[in-house]
């Protein structure tokens, strides 16, 4: 495993730790999810380029498309929640509260 792969895996794990620690605000959770998706994209692209696996060339692009869709839906949800509740706390998303 090269140093580049270790750095990308460390970036993914730091984003995961950030998602687990800073989950009170929706914006910080979305930023951590975006960091995880981008590190997965870079890792997939580098792995495919290094292994010369030509059948999976489209996999990083598909992952990037899903990341863009996730970001768009997350930002739309953030705008809706901040307009409705006035804050972006994740506790406001509990549907079981009356």
Swiss-Prot record:
Domain of life per record: Eukaryota
GO molecular function: NADH dehydrogenase (ubiquinone) activity
Location relative to the cell: Mitochondrion inner membrane
Residues that span the membrane, as ranges: 1-21, 29-49, 61-81
Main location: mitochondrion
The protein's enzyme class: translocase
Coiled coil: none
Record keywords, A-Z: Electron transport, Membrane, Mitochondrion, Mitochondrion inner membrane, NAD, Respiratory chain, Translocase, Transmembrane, Transmembrane helix, Transport, Ubiquinone
EC number: 7.1.1.2
Database matches in Pfam families: Oxidored_q2 (PF00420)
Membrane protein topology class: Multi-pass membrane protein
Catalytic activity: a ubiquinone + NADH + 5 H(+)(in) = a ubiquinol + NAD(+) + 4 H(+)(out)
Database matches in InterPro entries: NADH_UbQ_OxRdtase_chain4L/K, NUOK/Mnh_C1-like
GO CC annotation: mitochondrial inner membrane; respiratory chain complex I
Any one Gene Ontology BP term: ATP synthesis coupled electron transport
Role played: Core subunit of the mitochondrial membrane respiratory chain NADH dehydrogenase (Complex I) which catalyzes electron transfer from NADH through the respiratory chain, using ubiquinone as an electron acceptor. Part of the enzyme membrane arm which is embedded in the lipid bilayer and involved in proton translocation.
PANTHER family on file: NADH-UBIQUINONE OXIDOREDUCTASE CHAIN 4L (PTHR11434:SF0), NADH-UBIQUINONE OXIDOREDUCTASE SUBUNIT ND4L (PTHR11434)
Family to which the UniProt record says this protein belongs: Belongs to the complex I subunit 4L family.
Subunit-structure text: Core subunit of respiratory chain NADH dehydrogenase (Complex I) which is composed of 45 different subunits.
Name under which the protein is recorded: NADH-ubiquinone oxidoreductase chain 4L
UniProt source species: Balaena mysticetus
Designated gene of the protein: MT-ND4L
């Amino acid at each position: 495993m090269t140093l580049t792969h270790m750095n990308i895996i460390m970036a993914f794990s730091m984003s995961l730790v950030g998602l687990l620690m800073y989950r009170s605000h929706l914006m910080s959770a979305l930023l951590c999810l975006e960091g995880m998706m981008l590190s997965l994209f870079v890792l997939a692209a580098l792995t495919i380029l290094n292994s010369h696996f030509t059948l999976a060339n489209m996999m990083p692009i598909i992952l990037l498309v899903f990341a863009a869709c996730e970001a768009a839906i997350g930002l739309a949800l953030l705008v809706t929640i901040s307009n409705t509740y006035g804050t972006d706390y994740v506790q406001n998303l509990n549907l079981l509260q009356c």
